[in-house]
Amino acid sequence: MAKSKNHTTHNQSRKWHRNGIKKPRSQRYESLKGVDPKFLRNMRFAKKHNKKGLKKMQANNAKAMSARAEAIKALVKPKEVKPNIPKGGSRKLSRLAYIAHPKLGKRARARIAKGLRFCRPKSQAKAQSKAKATAGGTAAAPVPPASAPKGAQAPTKAPQ
């Protein structure tokens, strides 16, 4: 009778290594960085078997983490707080550079020009110029003398 081929050992190691040898779960994900690998393993088993020890284990781990944080706080000296200086000038320069750029600034320049066109109130500007003209006409303003031909002397006052 021929041997059953259900349980083969052929190419098994290749299958295992196809995805590479994986890192521990604590190093695999950014969110699990610094978490005890033993704790993660226990969590897996606890999820698998739904044990009551899960809550106790979590409480113990939380205590350990808080103790660790306190120890780190005690060891690390507090740094001097530097005053935060706002970076206003660099933003202004970068904006100007963007506007001056031949391709990128095309739309920005168009928007600025459009804004200037729309924001300038034409009726107010005309009204202000008219008001200045009327105010200047009523007040006694010195009228400039008629221009003399080029090279002519200015007229002198006659003695009385």
UniProtKB/Swiss-Prot annotation:
Gene: RPL29
Family per record: Belongs to the eukaryotic ribosomal protein eL29 family.
Keywords tagged on the record: Acetylation, Cytoplasm, Methylation, Phosphoprotein, Ribonucleoprotein, Ribosomal protein
PANTHER family: 60S RIBOSOMAL PROTEIN L29
Name of the featured protein: Large ribosomal subunit protein eL29
Chain positions found as N6-acetyllysine: K33
GO MF terms, alphabetically ordered: structural constituent of ribosome
Modified residues (Phosphoserine): S31
Subcellular location: Cytoplasm
Positions carrying N6-methyllysine: K5
Lineage of origin: Eukaryota, Metazoa, Chordata, Craniata, Vertebrata
UniProt-listed InterPro entries: Ribosomal_eL29
Basic residues: bias regions: 1-26
Pfam families tied to this protein: Ribosomal_L29e
Signal peptide positions on this chain: none
Region entry Disordered, spans: 1-32, 119-160
Described purpose of this protein according to its UniProt entry: Component of the large ribosomal subunit. The ribosome is a large ribonucleoprotein complex responsible for the synthesis of proteins in the cell.
One of the GO biological process terms: cytoplasmic translation
Source species of the chain: Sus scrofa
Compositionally skewed regions (Low complexity) per UniProt: 121-141
Highest rank taxon of the organism: Eukaryota
Complex formation: Component of the large ribosomal subunit.
Cellular component GO terms held in the UniProt record: cytoplasmic side of rough endoplasmic reticulum membrane; cytosolic large ribosomal subunit; large ribosomal subunit
